[in-house]
Amino acid sequence: MRRRLPAFLTLASIALAGVGLVGCSSEGASPSECSPVDIAAVREALPDSLAKAKLDPHSTDEDEHSFSVLYRAQDKEQVSLLGTKYEAEGSPVCPDDPNEAAQRYLELLHDDLDAQNADQQRPANEYSPFEFTAADRRFYCSAWPVEESVSTTCVTTVGDVALNYYLHRDGRDSAAEQQRMEDIGAELAPALQDLD
């Protein structure tokens, strides 16, 4: 089964431009201003495995502006990873501040999740933010309780691409889930180092 990118990924790109967190066009920009990258290059740079989870080649969904992949492990752990171009009015743009853009992107993910909860008459999530650095790359993350387990997501910026990953397992210890997300980020960061 092919995974479809959630609609909020495109919304997040447009909203970032609307609040002024993205600034330079990907055409003719100097390396000091922004580093546009090919979305396919980001996808191809991903490792074949993340700890025990192996990349599922049948899970990939990709177009010129976005992609999604899924890593699966035998113990039912899954990591879904989504990449999407920052855009403004249909054109690729790079963040003026990649860290601020990643933080804002995370806020927009929260907004989207809370809107989904509201549509289903459920309360808003109680997010616990955390952040970390791996191989000089900053990751902005959140953990929140869902029934008896803990959900987590992290965002980083690679050139003009927002890279977002989720951990899917029945983890109940927030500290353990946070550590697992940091371990995943530590594996991803070196693979992305030469892209931006």
Protein language model features and the residues they cover:
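Bacterial N-terminal signal peptides that target proteins for export
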Residues: M1-A12
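N-terminal start and proteolytic maturation junction detector
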Residues: S13-G18
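C-terminal motif of bacterial Sec signal peptides marking the signal peptidase cleavage site
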Residues: V19-G23
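A small/polar (G/S/T-enriched), proline-flanked helix-loop surface module common
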Residues: G28-D196
